[in-house]
Amino acid sequence: MSDRYDLIIVGGGPAGLAAAQAASAAGKRILIMEKDGWGGTCTHRGCIPTKALLACSRSYSGLKKLRRVGIGTGEATIDYAAMRRHQQQIVKIAALGARKLLADAGVEIAEGTGEIISPREIICTNPAGESRTVTADHLLIAWGSEAVVPRGISLSERIMTSDGIGAIDDLPASIIIVGASFIGVEYAVFFAQLGVKVILVELLERILPQEDEEAAQFLRQELVRLGVDVRTGAALAGLAETPAGVVMEV
C-alpha cells in the first residue's frame, strides 16, 4: 500500500475524528494516528469518564433522598472500586465506538506516535517500535493539550491534574480542587455527592467563568447546598504535602 495520502491527521480526539470523517466523505485518502486512546481527552479523561462517575454519585445521592419521602431502601453503601470499573467500561465502549466510526468511514488507522520531519512528511512509529515514513499533501495537527501545572507545584500521588484524579483507587476523605471550570465543577459535584469534604478554588470572581453568569450563579448555590466550600477570587499561593495531607495556601 502506498505511503502517500491526501491528509494525515495526528491525534484521534474529537477534532481529528471529525476532520477524518469529513475528508473521507469528500473522497480523500486519510491516515489518522493516535498514541494514547481513540476519542482523546474527552473520551478517556474528560467528558465521558466524568459523566460515568456522576451517574454513580447521582444514584447514591438519590437513594439517600428517598428516605425524606418515606421510602426505605436500607443502608446505602459506596463501592468505589465498582464505580471505577463502571467508568472504565463506559470509556472502553466509547473508545471502541470512535475507532469503528473511523474504520466505517474508510479512514486508515495507525496506533503510535508521529514525528514531523518536513511540512509533508511524518515518521509514524507503532507501539512495537516499528517506523515508516508517510507523506501527504496536507497535515492536520490535532494532538490536544495538557493540564497547566502552576509554577512551583510538584505533582505526586496526592497532588495531581484532572488527568489523574479520575483514576485514583480510593475515595478520599477530603479534596481541594483548583479551578472551577466545567471539569473542576463536575468533580466537585461527584465527590460531594459521595460525602467527601470538597474545597473548590477559583482565581476569577465566579465559577464557570466561560459560561452564562446566571447559570453559573445557580450552580454555585447548588454546590454550596451539597456542602462544597466554594472560594472565588482566590489565587493559589502554594501547596505542601504533610503526613496529615495536603496543605493549601491562598
Language model features by range: what are they?
Residues 2-5, 21-28, 33-171, 204-208, ...:
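Glycine-rich flavin
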Residues 6-32, 176, 183-193:
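N-terminal Rossmann-like FAD-binding beta1-loop-alpha1 element of flavoenzymes
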Residues 12, 91, 180, 212:
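Charged, low-complexity surface patches
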Residues 13, 113-115, 181, 234-235:
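Conserved acidic residues
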Residues 16, 95, 184, 213-216:
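Generic non-transmembrane alpha-helix signal with a bias for helix starts/N-cap capping motifs
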Residues 27, 195-197, 227:
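Glycine-centered short loops/turns at secondary-structure junctions
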Residues 158, 169-211:
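Rossmann-like NAD(P)H-binding beta-loop-alpha module
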Residues 220-232:
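ALDH superfamily catalytic-core signature
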